[in-house]
Amino acid sequence: MALQIPSLLLSAAVVVLMVLSSPGTEGGDSERHFVYQFMGECYFTNGTQRIRYVTRYIYNREEYVRYDSDVGEHRAVTELGRPDAEYWNSQPEILERTRAELDTVCRHNYEGPETHTSLRRLEQPNVVISLSRTEALNHHNTLVCSVTDFYPAKIKVRWFRNGQEETVGVSSTQLIRNGDWTFQVLVMLEMTPRRGEVYTCHVEHPSLKSPITVEWRAQSESAWSKMLSGIGGCVLGVIFLGLGLFIRHRSQKGPRGPPPAGLLQ
């Protein structure tokens, strides 16, 4: 689906250049009209949320320069456009502004007014807490709250310790773009875990009816060892149970002897 960008957003700017011909040409001082057009286009691929931004520069109804966001730079369509394309590509400000229009123009329209609800997208975040180093009580450590695969970009992530918000020792990465338009962010909390403490990562996002809260509890090394021992015991129990059932099944079949003598006559 191609959406024409409104004129106020550089959709179709038509500039008519009035050039007076030199005396003696075209039979006198008659005016000549040269038409220069600029057109911007946003292409939304149905079902994929992928956007492609294309700008076309047209002189006297002939396109001579084109910018394609899939290419990332201006390309000359005709020899007339080669000097302009080379110049625009050599200017970081121009190239950066043109590349940014994928967001400021196309994505702005996509996320735009509520009247365009058919184009809106909401993706709920996934939230996971991890510890940067092997757990040890009363030693400095870092909790990492990984918030991934959410859209739109607006999100609020907070840390709580035993129900009280933590503001000291909190840091965050910049929003990281995924290839499918979704985002991810990491929010870290510098802390010293003590037995019985409960840390909570609290996430608010437009896609959620209520915030997501994920807890992490500080455990002593003995409690951690007991938990691992319990898991290991369960695994060994399942293995021995399966082995016993297999041996019993084999023993119930019994050895097969030769057929009765009467059947051989």
Curated annotation (Swiss-Prot):
Keyword Phosphoprotein: no
Chain spans, region Beta-1: 28-122
SUPFAM superfamilies for the chain: Immunoglobulin, MHC antigen-recognition domain
Post-translational modification: Ubiquitinated in immature dendritic cells leading to down-regulation of MHC class II.
GO cellular component terms attached to this protein's record: early endosome; external side of plasma membrane; Golgi apparatus; membrane; MHC class II protein complex; multivesicular body; plasma membrane
Entry's transmembrane regions: 227-247
GO biological process, one term: antigen processing and presentation of peptide antigen
SMART domains: IGc1, MHC_II_beta
Protein's cellular compartments: Membrane
Pfam assignment, any one: MHC_II_beta
Alphabetical UniProt keywords: Adaptive immunity, Disulfide bond, Glycoprotein, Immunity, Membrane, MHC II, Signal, Transmembrane, Transmembrane helix, Ubl conjugation
Family classification: Belongs to the MHC class II family.
Domain of life: Eukaryota
Protein name as annotated: H-2 class II histocompatibility antigen, A beta chain
Extracellular side: 28-226
Gene3D superfamilies: Class II Histocompatibility Antigen, M Beta Chain, Chain B, domain 1, Immunoglobulins
Membrane topology, Cytoplasmic segments: 248-265
Membrane topology: Single-pass type I membrane protein
Region annotation (Connecting peptide) ranges: 217-226
Naturally occurring in which organism (per UniProt): Mus musculus
InterPro entries tied to this protein: Ig-like_dom (IPR007110), Ig-like_dom_sf (IPR036179), Ig-like_fold (IPR013783), Ig/MHC_CS (IPR003006), Ig_C1-set (IPR003597), MHC/Immunoglobulin (IPR050160), MHC_I/II-like_Ag-recog (IPR011162), MHC_II_a/b_N (IPR014745)
Gene of this entry: H2-Ab1
